[in-house]
Amino acid sequence: GEIIHTEGAYIHNLDPFWNEYQDNWRYEFNKKHRGDIYPTHGMGPACWALDIHRGDRMKTLIAMDTDAFNGKKLAQKHGEESYLNGDHTTTLIRTEKGKTIEIQHNVVTPRPYNRMYQVEGTEGFANKYPNEGFSIIENLDGEAYVSSEMRDALMAEYQHPITREGSLVETARRVGGHGGMDFIMDYRLIYCLRNGLPLDQDVYDAAEWSCLGELTRVSIE
């Protein structure tokens, strides 16, 4: 099959955390900028799945946002009136090869934390977070994911080589950092550097994922 659509997001109500950032920088940045100002959380996995910069490239973008309904309430708590970032921002991207990416940003509504990692293909679908589920074209139900037994079998068959190292996974869980994810990412970075391998993401990836912040603002305005 062929992957045709991916999704990712940063949806995380930050009400408990606004005051924890030095000099209130995160509130200030949201207050002063429209667009998806934190696209990389979702863009990384979405672009990797579609081989962006490794066979395909992003070509066109359109973004929309809601008004800052809760954002302005947040500003009022700080004794201010202006707040530019919309409560919810959605971005659609089309690639050179006719694939699409959807990215969302939302840090002020009561919606529960969600990274919306989804991969859609011609012969299957995977939903990774917050609820893991898969569907495949063989014996397709159309209204439900595959059974837990088949899901576990698929996860075992396609398990990433890094996570096959049991001791590494256990160390990651013990050290922590976003459930061990931070440790795995640091481990992979150092492994590549030690072994002379190209990094999993390069400066071109970082630049293009990050530029969505400004491009989405331009699209919206």
PLM feature spans:
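Short glycine/serine/proline-enriched coil/turn segments at secondary-structure junctions
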Residues: 14-17, 109-112, 127
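C-terminal helical cap and adjacent loop that interface with cofactors, partners, or active-site loops
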Residues: 42, 47, 112-221
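Predominantly a Rossmann-like dinucleotide-binding segment in NAD(P)-dependent oxidoreductases
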Residues: 1-83, 189
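Structured core elements
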Residues: 92, 102-104, 118
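Short, flexible loop/turn elements at secondary-structure junctions
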Residues: 10, 65-68, 95-97, 107, ...
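Short, mixed charged/polar active-site loops
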Residues: 100-102, 125
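Active-site beta-strand termini and strand-to-loop segments that position acidic
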Residues: 86, 91-97, 121
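Residue-level marker for the onset of beta-strands and adjacent loop->beta junctions
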Residues: 87-89, 105, 115
